[in-house]
Swiss-Prot record:
This is DNA repair protein RAD52 homolog. It comes from Gallus gallus (Chicken). Involved in double-stranded break repair. Plays a central role in genetic recombination and DNA repair by promoting the annealing of complementary single-stranded DNA and by stimulation of the RAD51 recombinase. Residues 243-252, 384-401 have a biased composition (Polar residues). Gene3D superfamilies: DNA repair protein Rad52/59/22. One of its GO terms (biological process) is double-strand break repair via single-strand annealing. The gene is RAD52. Residues 12-21 have a biased composition (Low complexity). Residues 1-21, 228-255, 281-306, 343-422 are annotated as: Disordered. Keywords: DNA damage, DNA recombination, DNA repair, DNA-binding, Nucleus. Residues 153-157 bind DNA. GO terms for cellular component: nucleus. Residues 357-378, 412-422 have a biased composition (Basic residues).
Length: 422
């Protein structure tokens, strides 16, 4: 059964390869050169040292030697290359699944085939067992993986001593067990992979793409004195910014062959553009507040006309926080006298307040700080003087001073009001 499936798969692969172009060879049709064949054959004849061999206790207290799966795979990659061999599971069967006291016992066998890129292959059977697990799925998983790994090691063992065939020699095992084991080398941080990007692989892949697109590219690159450009990076960045459209035409094949340099150059361009944008934004933010201040408060110079200065003073006085102005009743106050009192230094504010006997008026106190003294008469008084003069003639008997409506004088008037008999 496995042989029939293997023949069917081989016929399918051969038919698919013949249907494609003859220039591209499929896996299994590559031919080793004489040097490659001789080097691989010599490497497979070597026997493994004690560093590759592990041991464990088997049933009955017997000591068994074996090779770990990851070590076998590493050895195969060294011998044949990462793309020089492949393995496949041709068949896998579950022999038994038993449930005993809530625990599962599973046995699985698998047929594994290992094939090289020239078409030669070896196939063997592996077996995996799982005992005592409470989960049926985990038992099947463990048994299947163990069967495939065992079949892979047995199939690779058929290629030579370097892949594990020497372990079957008992005399060799006795001699190897007497040899001292070498200490594993210390971890070299330089050789460890610390980032995702591999510049050598990227450069080789880029060169391969260029070579497939342009067969004569390799000769041009070899004829060039160097693959590095003669200009510095700074000049290159400025040239690319000034002439973005013609940069693709002026680049030489020597610059195109270095993918790493182009990537770094692109990063520098983007960084420089980013910093230029940030500098422009910072300059705009600095100019905007200064322009606002210049428009809000224009400087008054000696050459400024007097009319303009008067308009600025009127506007400033009009928007001043004159809270005393809102406590004045325009109907009962003579604004002409009020302006005279203000100009004389508010003498009425120094006199004791008079208690109004005519009526009591409910007022609320404003908690905003009041300005008691003014250096300039309010402009609104001058604007309202004509209208106030008309009302002062009809209400001349009921004149009041601003001190009567001042929030600082109300508390004293209320105290006097409480002391007076009703």
């Amino acid at each position: 059964m496995p042989e029939r499936q293997g023949k069917d798969s081989e016929s399918h692969v051969s038919s698919s390869c013949t249907s494609t172009s003859n220039s591209v060879a499929c896996f299994g049709q590559y031919q080793y050169t004489a040097n490659e064949y001789q080097a691989i054959q010599h490497a497979l004849r070597q026997k493994l040292g004690p560093e590759y061999i592990s041991s464990r206790q088997a049933g009955g207290g017997q000591k068994v030697c074996y090779i770990e799966g990851h070590k076998v795979i590493s050895l195969a990659n060294e011998m044949f290359g990462f793309n020089g061999w492949a393995h496949s599971v041709t068949q896998q069967n579950v022999d038994f699944v038993d449930l005993n006291n809530g625990r599962f016992y599973v046995g699985v066998c698998a047929f594994v085939k290992v094939q090289l890129k020239d078409g030669s292959y070896h196939e063997d059977v592996g077996y995996g067992v799982s005992e005592g697990l409470k989960s049926k799925a985990l038992s099947l998983e463990k048994a299947r993986k163990e069967a495939v790994t065992d079949g892979l090691k047995r199939a690779l063992k058929c290629f030579g001593n370097a892949l594990g065939n020497c372990i079957l020699d008992k005399d060799y095992l006795q001699a190897v067990n007497k040899l001292p084991r070498q200490m594993p080398p210390e971890l070299d941080l330089v050789k460890t992979k610390r980032q995702d990007y591999e510049p050598e692989i990227e450069k080789a892949r880029y060169d391969g793409c260029l070579e497939r697109q342009n067969p004569g590219w390799r000769q041009q690159c070899e004829m060039a004195p160097t693959c590095k450009p003669t200009h510095t990076e700074a000049s290159r960045v400025t040239e690319d910014q000034k002439q973005p459209s013609s940069s693709g035409n002026t680049d030489s094949p020597a610059v195109e062959c270095d993918a790493t340099y182009q990537r770094k150059l692109r990063q520098k361009q983007l960084q420089q553009q980013f910093w230029e944008q940030m500098e422009k934004r910072r300059q705009v933010k600095e100019v905007t507040p200064s322009s606002k201040q210049a428009t809000a408060n224009p400087p008054v110079k000696h050459s400024t006309p007097a009319a303009v200065q008067q308009e600025l003073a009127i506007e400033e006085e009009f928007f001043a926080d004159d809270l005393e102005l809102w406590d004045i009743s325009l109907e009962t106050t003579d604004l002409n006298k009020l302006m005279c009192h203000k100009a004389a230094g508010s003498p009425a504010a120094q006199q004791p307040p008079e208690t109004p006997h005519r009526r009591h008026q409910m007022t609320t106190r404003n908690r905003t700080p009041q300005r008691m003294h003014y250096h300039k008469p309010p402009v609104r008084f001058a604007q309202l003087q004509p209208s106030a003069a008309l009302t002062s003639n009809s209400h001349g008997a009921n004149q009041r001073t601003p001190a009567e409506h001042s929030p600082y004088r109300r508390s004293q008037s209320w105290k006097k009001r409480r002391l007076e008999p009703t």
